Design a protein with these regions (language model features):
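Short, intrinsically disordered low-complexity segments
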Residues: 49-52
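Short, hydrophobic-biased segments on the C-terminal half of alpha helices
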Residues: 54-58
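A short, conserved structural fragment
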Residues: 61-66
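Short acidic, hydrophobic short linear motifs in intrinsically disordered regions
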Residues: 24-47
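N-terminal acidic leader/helix
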Residues: 1-31
């Protein structure tokens, strides 16, 4: 994933997560390395540009979240 695409998907994700009701933020939205990723975990990983953030964003792009 190129940096420009990453930044665009990151921006879209942060806008989307802001609209997710708080009770739903513990729901699983992705699985990375056999680890369940909730909205909260995804937000933390993506905000700090962690290595898993690209994989998370790619999965969310595939399912139409971003």
């Amino acid at each position: 994933m190129k940096d420009k695409e990453y930044q665009l998907l990151k921006s879209k994700f942060l806008k989307a997560v802001a609209n997710v009701p708080i009770p739903l933020r513990d729901e699983i939205i992705a699985v990375v390395d056999n680890e369940n990723i909730s909205w909260r975990v995804a937000e933390a990983e993506i905000k700090k540009d962690a290595p898993k953030s690209k994989v998370i964003l790619e999965q969310l792009k595939k399912i139409g979240v971003v």
